[in-house]
C-alpha cells in the first residue's frame, strides 16, 4: 500500500470540528434518504451559538446517532468481508441476520460515519450493483474498494482516495507465463478479472490478450485460475501475501521495472451527485488520517482477514 501519494484535502483546516460534532439525519439525509447536506458547513462544524433549549437543537439531539448505510460486497478481503462474531473492528450487516462486516473499508467507514455524526451499518450487495443501489437509495455511501473511474464519475461523485496501490498478475505454478517480465510476454494468454472493476479493465493493456468474461468476485477469479479455466488473473498487489496463502498453486508474475501495469489502484468513497458539503466532510475525515494510521488499519485488516 502506498499512502505517500494519497492526495490531502486543502480545506481540512477550516472544518476541523467535523470529526467532533454529531450531525442530525435531517441535515444529511433528505430527498428520500439521499445524502444532501442542508444549510452551511457551519451547521456541520458546530460553529453556531444555538441555545441548547431551542427546538432546533432539541431536534438535532433526537436525530443524532442515525445510521449511515454503507454499500460493500463483504466478500473482498482485506477490503471487506463477512464475519460471524462482533468485535471492535466490525459493523453489523443490515441485510444479513446475525452477520457483521470487517476489513479496511469498514475501518474507513467508521471514521466517515463519525465525521457525519452517524452509526455505520453495512449493506451487502454485489459489486456491480452498488452504484444502482446508491441511485435507488438502498445505501447512503459506497465504501467497497471502488476505483473512481471516469465512467463511474458520470453516475456518482467520489471522495479523495483512501487507498493507493498497484495491479499484478497471478499464473499457475509451472505455467509457461511464470517467467514473463513484461505485459507483452503475456500475448496470447487468457486472462480473467473481477466483473465491473478495474481488475477487468486493465486486462486490455496486455498486447494480444484473450480477455475472458469477467467473474463476480476475486475468489471466483482465483478459482478459475487454479482450475485451469484461465492462464492468468489480475489482482491488487497489496493483497498478494493473503491470496498466496489461501490459494495454493498460484504464483505472481514479476515484471521488470516499468513493464507491468501502469495504472495505480485507487479506492474512494462514492456518494450521490451534488452532495458537495457531505464530500467535504468525508474528505476532511480522510485528511485527518495520517499515512501511519492508514498503514496501521491496512496491516490490521491483513492480519484479521479470513483464510
Residue ranges and their predicted role:
Residues 25-29:
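N-terminal export leaders
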Residues 145-155, 202-205, 231-263:
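A ligand-binding cleft/hinge motif common to bilobed small-molecule-binding domains
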Residues 164-173, 241-286, 302-307:
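Periplasmic-binding protein-like
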Residues 1-23, 34-43:
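N-terminal secretory signal peptides
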Residues 47-57:
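Bacterial lipoprotein signal-peptidase II cleavage site
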Residues 49, 198-212, 252, 283-307:
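Ligand-binding clefts/hinges and TM-proximal coupling segments of bilobed small-molecule sensing domains
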Residues 119-185, 260:
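Acidic, polar ligand-binding/catalytic clefts
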Residues 64-145:
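Extracytoplasmic small-molecule ligand-binding "clamshell" domains
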